Amino acid sequence: NDGVYIGVTATPARLDLNNTFQNENHKWVFFQPHSEYKGQDFFFPIESQGNVFAVDYNLYFLKDESHNPSKELRDSIYRYLVNSTNLNLFVNQKIKNYVMLIHTSVKMENHTGDKKVTNDLFSELAQKKGPKFLRHMEQIYNFALKKTEDEEKAKKICKFIATNADKHQIGVLNSDRNNKLGFDLKKFSEEPSSLFTISIGGNIISRGITFNNLISMFFTRGVKGLMQQDTYIQRARMFGNRGKDANHFELTITESIYKQWFSCFLLHRLSYLSAKNNLHQVWLEGSRTRAVAPSSIDKSYVRVDKGEISFSKI
């Protein structure tokens, strides 16, 4: 009864609104992130250039309604191959094994479909001949030329990929028992063991797993209703420490999901400021986002107000 509980959280809203362990928010201590950590200010910056988000990495928007999701995934894999190869040939002092993360759905049957698209592509590349191989190489050359604007570099990138395409591994990270048999998670996350490493998954990958050398992310997992800030703030931890590769990172995502995710962090910033400046914590929600799940709120402890807020020019 005389003990003191000290907790650490990345999602203070849920802790506070849930009244977890009779939380005393006036005693909170706020820690600064590590200097190498790339967080909300890097991936979801407030700054814009006209109507475009002013990001310092490669942000590739998809249409909300896809008529050919398999092609979108293949194109993203092509760009990943080109991007990682470009770094290994023309930037890095030594070869690095880069990871691409594919997160399209929480449903495990969809992970099987994503794996088939990925398997087929790499299997056809590994054959090093035939019409399918040539079609892949043509697409890869086009992406390489667009990226480098240099025909010789584009040809070298294609040659490297054609030679090394068999140095790949594809893993599905979910709760399916068959996928866990003999599966070494570190090889697909913290310590990628193959030149081209593809990690596919659902909830498991967004629960605090660290992905080192993550250079590409294909994210199309939307939400049916409102996006929960606590869930998507936690999910963003997979971005993590990008180091010197940060500006070469590519996020492929639908524009609507990105904007919802951006709104989560924008409202979180405002709420965080109220807490950090010794004001009574106010956890803000938007028209398409909510702070936490309604079931997580201790209604005897929390007052909910609804209305509109206006601001003068800042």
Question: What does each model-identified segment do?
Answer:
Residues V8-P12, H34, T104-V106, I200-I204, ...:
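A short beta-strand-to-loop transition that corresponds to the Sensor-1 phosphate-sensing loop
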